[in-house]
Amino acid sequence: GVAVYLEKPLAITMEGATRVLRTAYETGTKLYVGHNMRHMNVVREMRNIIRSGRIGEVKTIWCRHFVGTGGDFYFKDWHATREHGTGLLLQKAAHDIDVMHWLADSHTNDVVAMGDLMVYNQVTDRADNSHLLMGDWFDNNNWPPLSQKGLNPVIDVEDVSMMLMRMESGVLASYEQCH
């Protein structure tokens, strides 16, 4: 019965998510998933503007997340493997997609997506960083992406993704994640 704040993602598999939701429902436990971007001032202001009607009715939403400097760390540790992290769509896009849903006041009911490993598969400098803390290997000056060093020995998740979504309200949305 104690309320639970759970950092996203809810789980990394549908089975895991179903188990968490079922348990919360069966026990009457309040569950809040930590989608923290909706609490950022700029996002709250966007929602206020939309709700005020000043820009008319939302018909489409477009979001391009240029992962850029700093996003590389997802390819230097356990995030780089599908087994442990399932990829950037779950780890990073979850924030952006939550904001898109929140701004549209609607959820996705149709989606088509594709992604590929197109950038970091070209970097040959690999290292096992599992014994290090992130601060020991993170460097904000690693740019461009192909200059990266010490990437995880195994990278089997996409580094580029695109999605098209149709929301319950009829809003069409597109999302792109690139480096």
Where are these regions (language model features)?
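Beta-strand-loop-alpha-helix segment that lines the small-molecule cofactor/substrate pocket
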Residues: 1-38, 53
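Short, well-ordered coil/turn segments that N-cap beta-strands
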Residues: 2, 29-30, 57-59, 169-171
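Structural detector of well-ordered beta-strand residues that form the stable sheet scaffold
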Residues: 5, 30-32, 62, 112, ...
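Predominantly a Rossmann-like dinucleotide-binding segment in NAD(P)-dependent oxidoreductases
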Residues: 37-153
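Glycine-rich phosphate/pyrophosphate-binding beta-alpha loops
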Residues: 94, 172-179
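Secondary-structure transition into beta-strands, especially the periplasmic turns and strand N-termini
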Residues: 105-107, 168-173
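Histidine- and/or cysteine-centered catalytic micro-motif in compact active-site loops
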Residues: 116, 168, 177-179
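Active-site beta-strand termini and strand-to-loop segments that position acidic
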Residues: 158, 163-170
